[in-house]
Amino acid sequence: MLSEILLIPAATGALAFAGLKLRKQKQYRQLEARQHDLAVRYGVALNLPDRLPTELPDFRQRIVVIPDPLPVAAFEILREAALRRGNTERSYFPAHKQGGTVAYEYLHDIAPEIVAFYQSDYLRRLCSAVIGEPVVPTPIHDQSSCSLLFYERPQDHINWHYDYNFYHGRHFTVLVPLVNCHLQEDRLSSARLVIRQDSREITIPTPPNTLIVFEGARVFHKVTRLEENELRVMLSMTFCTRPQTSLLKGTIRRFKDIAYFGVRALWT
């Protein structure tokens, strides 16, 4: 009798989870259907170059920095799109991270220009040329595929970590600093991207309109703490050589995403 009583809430919970999962899958199909239209409509305004830079840095250290990868007008469009966002999803894990995030699915409505840039042929070709093999954007249900990272309160940071690879192929993080400044002084913020390489700590320059490409599963990295009257807004994107995944990796990804996007990540 007791076991039958306990089965009722368990079954109810399972049905509720399945319903949320199906609803989320439908939403992702609708967003995917919109992506082509967004890329065409906002891609015209971005007016990205047809040709790639003639000289590209070497990727042997699994991280490169490309200054001024975007025309000024295109960069300003992305920056303004990021700054008109609504509230960020704040996360705080003692001794590891603190900050705000805007997830991929929300960018389709509040910053479609950013989605168009992420899906652009120019960015895909540029990243492929830098890395040395073809890459593609990661799937829409991965909330970290394309997101905005807001360091907007004192002490916002993320401690030393690797970026876990949830896919069968190689996985890369691509960053574009959209805002990085002290709000009252003419200088960059105190939040700095630092990597550990050959037992040395190296600060990676992140002024606005810089493209940073790195293989996060191989590059140990952190972002130092923001101070008062500072703002740092990063466009964070991910690409991979093979976007397929396994059930186990997909489950791990969803639990990881809880740290950034809350419990709703469980049914992405």
Describe the function of each predicted region.
Residues 1-59, 258-268:
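Fe(II)/2-oxoglutarate
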Residues 5-8, 110-123, 138-139, 175-186, ...:
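Short N-terminal helix-initiation segments at or just after the protein's N-terminus
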Residues 43-131, 225-268:
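Non-heme Fe(II)/2-oxoglutarate
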Residues 68-69, 217, 237:
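Short, well-ordered beta-to-alpha junction loops that form the rim of enzyme active sites
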Residues 128-218, 230-233, 241-249:
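Catalytic core of non-heme Fe(II) oxygenases with the double-stranded beta-helix
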Residues 221-222:
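Short glycine-rich, flexible loops that bind phosphorylated cofactors or substrates
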